[in-house]
Amino acid sequence: YVALALWMTKYYVQEYGFNLQTAALLAACFSLPGGVLRAAGGWMSDKWGAHSVTWWVMWVSWICLFLLSYPQTEMVIQTVNGPQNLSIGLNATMFTVLIFIVGIAFAFGKASVFKYISDDFPQNIGAVSGIVGLAGGMGGFILPIMFGALVDITGVRSSAFMLMYGVVWVSLIWMYFSEVRKTPMMGQGANSPVSKAS
């Protein structure tokens, strides 16, 4: 979250040509829900469990990051009527909508992480919270450097989202084998909307 929040303004300036003020305003579409909606994420984690909320957060993030990671592409298609140019890529509006959704998902995810801590480490909440905070701080420091290195290596600005997509993909696989197969799909027993429907 911190890494993307730091990266967004520069991305808007370089990818879409906005001035700094407009870019910062649009970048807030990611940062604002990521901070404001944590309470809603905490409520959802209390109601359906941290594991379930995190699982769905991962899937929403995975889909959005896949779309965000696709670079601006120009293709020439040879048709019977001659060559046709085809442009594939997100315009600024679609990009902002997707990054807003990612911001909401990350807000819920941040809340569910601390629900994890209270559920799984009730005797060591302070120590584990400190480790989680350290990991978040290091991610906010290291990932922007990696984003810049990827842009230098590939020349593709959306490579930052490719990296995030890969991280979420690995996390989904890890979470599936370590947790999802052992728990109900949407929460804890009778409190799950899925179990009520069935």
What are the residue ranges of the model-derived segments?
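A late C-terminal transmembrane helix in Major Facilitator Superfamily
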Residues: 124-154
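Residue-level signature of mid-helix packing/kink "hotspots" within the transmembrane helices
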Residues: 31-39, 137-141
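Multi-pass alpha-helical transporter architecture, strongest
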Residues: 165-198
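Paired intracellular helix-loop junctions of major facilitator superfamily
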Residues: 116-126
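Extracytoplasmic gate region of multi-pass secondary transporters
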Residues: 1-35
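Helix-to-loop junctions at the C-terminal end of transmembrane segments
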Residues: 37-49, 151-152
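A membrane-interface helix-boundary motif in multi-pass transporters
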Residues: 149-166
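C-terminal transmembrane helical hairpin of 12-TM major facilitator-type secondary transporters
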Residues: 51-113
